[in-house]
Amino acid sequence: MQAKAVTKYVRISPTKVRPVMDLVRGKPVDRALAILRYLPHKAAREIARTIESARANATNNYDMAPDALVVKYIFADEGPAFKRIMPRARGRADRIRKRTTHITVIVDDGEEM
């Protein structure tokens, strides 16, 4: 059985989040959280929050054992970008795109319904 958690509009670029996700994909939830705890990336904190939410959803909504959960799927989709203006020389301006990310985590206990 699977449980899902989504964190939307995280103010980090998806290209910065995806390499951190690769470290925990397919690992047990407890091991994944231990790995993320010692990473210096801002993305690691957001991914850990989402994994903890998926674990809580699994235990509270589906009565799964929290120690048997594995991070089955984890991916980052691009959210809307905030557009900002950066003034440049000679009256010009450049557009700055502040990108956002939607983080999705699906945990599984390996049992069929």
From Swiss-Prot:
It comes from the Bacteria. Transmembrane segments: none annotated. The keyword ATP-binding does not apply. PROSITE patterns: RIBOSOMAL_L22. InterPro entries: Ribosomal_uL22, Ribosomal_uL22_bac/chlpt-type, Ribosomal_uL22_bac/org-type, Ribosomal_uL22_CS, Ribosomal_uL22_sf. GO terms for biological process: translation. Belongs to the universal ribosomal protein uL22 family. This protein binds specifically to 23S rRNA; its binding is stimulated by other ribosomal proteins, e.g. L4, L17, and L20. It is important during the early stages of 50S assembly. It makes multiple contacts with different domains of the 23S rRNA in the assembled 50S subunit and ribosome. This is Large ribosomal subunit protein uL22. It comes from Roseiflexus castenholzii (strain DSM 13941 / HLO8). The lineage of its organism: Bacteria, Bacillati, Chloroflexota, Chloroflexia, Chloroflexales.
